[in-house]
Amino acid sequence: PLPLKMGTLDEHNTYFIPFEEEEVFIMPPQEYAGLLENPKFADIQVLDVLAYPDGNPGFYFVSLDYAPGVEAVFAAEQAERKQPQVDRVGLLGQIVEVTHPFLDIGQVADAFDGDKGTLIRTLEANPLNLMLVFEEAVELRSVTAWLGNARSAIRVEVIDDQGRHYQFEGFDAGNEALHPVRLDFGQILTITSIHLSLESLDEKEPAHVHLWDVVFE
């Protein structure tokens, strides 16, 4: 049997992934039309067309390659995606500046809304780094992250109002059920900033790192 794989050209459009010899893509008319407008691709050849009963094109069988010089385009796009994003989130009675990587699911505020039905997911960054800067220092004794089934490391660095740094680390084997991982500071700290890093241990970048919620106590 012929090797078949379900998917789209999105991965080839996001990362430079050389096409295999004799690789053929089967796509509907809308996807084919978008392909023709995409400057990243060249040498687009229609090998066959499967028509609907009414005669209109249903699926195109297409071979293609990358346009010359496209690797530089991918490199520039990846460099842009690595630029940290900054949002402001209502948290602990104040507006907090949160620096985070590009996300492809959710808004960064979803990680702090107390709703386990929402989540954030990185587009490709592993670890997921969140830097929170408080305009007014807050008193905290722990941070809890709600995680899923990925084997993970969670690392937290806090800076108190005297400029002292404290580091905490925990590991999680993953679980099919959504569950909390708590890092206890062992004391109440008066904090001006928190850096939370969540790493998916069994994946290399690019990877999707999921975070459902962060709770401060």
Roles of regions detected by a PLM:
Residues E20-E23, L140, I191:
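A general structural motif
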Residues Y66-E136, W146-A150, D213-E217:
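Disordered, acidic Ser/Thr/Pro-rich linker "stalks" and the adjacent N-terminal cap
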Residues N126, G148-E217:
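Trp- and acidic/polar-enriched beta-sheet ligand-binding modules for extracellular glycan
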Residues P1-L64, P127, R151-A153, D172:
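Catalytic lumenal/periplasmic loop and adjoining terminal transmembrane helix
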Residues Q30-P39, P68-A72, L140, E203-E205:
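Short, surface-exposed beta-strand/loop "edge" segments at domain boundaries and coil↔beta transitions
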